[in-house]
Structures are given as structure tokens and as C-alpha cells.
Regions:
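N-terminal, charge-rich interaction modules
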Residues: 1-49, 55
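Divalent-metal-activated hydrolytic enzyme cores
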Residues: 1-11, 15, 19-22, 108-148
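Short, surface-exposed beta-edge/turn micro-motifs
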Residues: 38-41, 85-86, 122
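Short HxH-centered metal-ligating active-site micro-motif
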Residues: 59-102
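Short amphipathic beta-strand/extended segments with alternating polar/hydrophobic composition
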Residues: 52-59, 135-138
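Hydrophobic, Leu/Ile/Phe/Ala-enriched alpha-helical segments that form helix-helix packing faces
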Residues: 25-30, 76-80, 110-117
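Short Gly/Thr/Asp-enriched flexible loops that form oxyanion-binding sites at enzyme active sites
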Residues: 99-111
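Short beta-strand segments
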Residues: 45, 90-92, 125-127
């Protein structure tokens, strides 16, 4: 725990390393989703913790324009019952953890939705059955056999 900042009411929690939590998210996805192709979902909340989610069918992607993605992200933020500071957004999708157009589209929508609340997301990640990707930094991790 860091000492209190004079401009804040209480102590500041150090940022938590997201890598173990992302590993856990990959493991949970592998347990619940055995199919190679499944509908993507976007989440807002805490990795390996409380979250709000939206699942969209792959066949509906053509109608998911930027405005609708922003509305979905704003709605997820409105439904999130915890303090939004430190909140992350992540996309769960099939495929490999490499940057795709879908990732960038949802990252943009998340950034805009957070900005309307004068916040920045603590991270934007992609989780697949094979691993995870930090879309902002390009850091990723891939497993052939993940043991939790």
C-alpha cells in the first residue's frame, strides 16, 4: 500500500499485475467454451472478478457500427456497480491473440465510453482460448497446455 496522496482521501492501492488474472481468464474460457468458433463477448469490470458482459453473434457484426459499440460500452459502464477507477475492458473471441480489426473497434468504443465519464480504462485486453493480448502495448502470452 502506498502512502496517502495529499490530494486524496485515503491510501492508494498499487496497480495489480494483470498477467496472472488474464491467465485465469484464459483458463476459465477453456473450461466453459470447448468450441473453436463461438460468439465474441465484451466485458467491463475486474479481471477474474465482477464484470458486466455483452455477447454479440458473429452474424450481427455487420450491423455493429461504432455508435452501437459505444452504446454497448456505455451501458456496461452504467450497469457496473463498483467504483469505475481501475476498471478494465476486455474482449473474448475465438482465434489467436493477435491484433485484429475487431479488437481495435472495441478498444476505440471502450476508450470513448470511458472518456465520457472522464476516466481511462485501466487496460484493454483480448482473451482467446490460446492466450491473451494487451491491445495497448502489444504484450501477449500464448499457451498450448495451460495448467491452472
Amino acid at each position: 500500500m502506498l502512502p496517502p496522496d495529499p490530494g486524496q482521501a485515503g491510501a492508494v492501492q498499487p496497480p495489480q499485475d494483470p498477467r496472472p488474472l488474464l491467465r485465469l481468464e484464459v483458463g476459465r474460457l477453456r473450461v466453459r467454451e470447448s468450441r473453436r468458433l463461438f460468439d465474441p463477448s465484451v466485458h467491463v469490470g475486474r479481471l477474474a472478478g465482477p464484470r458486466r458482459s455483452f455477447v454479440f453473434r458473429a452474424q450481427d457484426r455487420p450491423v455493429m457500427d461504432r455508435g452501437l459499440r459505444v452504446e454497448v460500452m456505455c451501458s456496461l459502464l452504467d450497469e457496473h456497480e463498483e467504483d469505475l477507477a481501475g476498471t478494465v475492458a476486455w474482449l473474448v473471441r475465438p482465434g489467436v491473440p493477435e491484433v485484429s480489426d475487431l479488437d481495435l473497434e472495441w478498444q476505440s468504443a471502450a476508450g470513448f465510453a470511458f472518456a465520457t465519464r472522464e476516466l481511462r480504462p485501466a487496460g484493454f485486453y483480448v482473451v482467446t482460448r490460446g492466450g491473451w493480448l494487451d491491445v495497448r502495448t502489444g504484450e501477449s502470452r500464448v499457451w498450448k497446455r495451460l495448467r491452472l
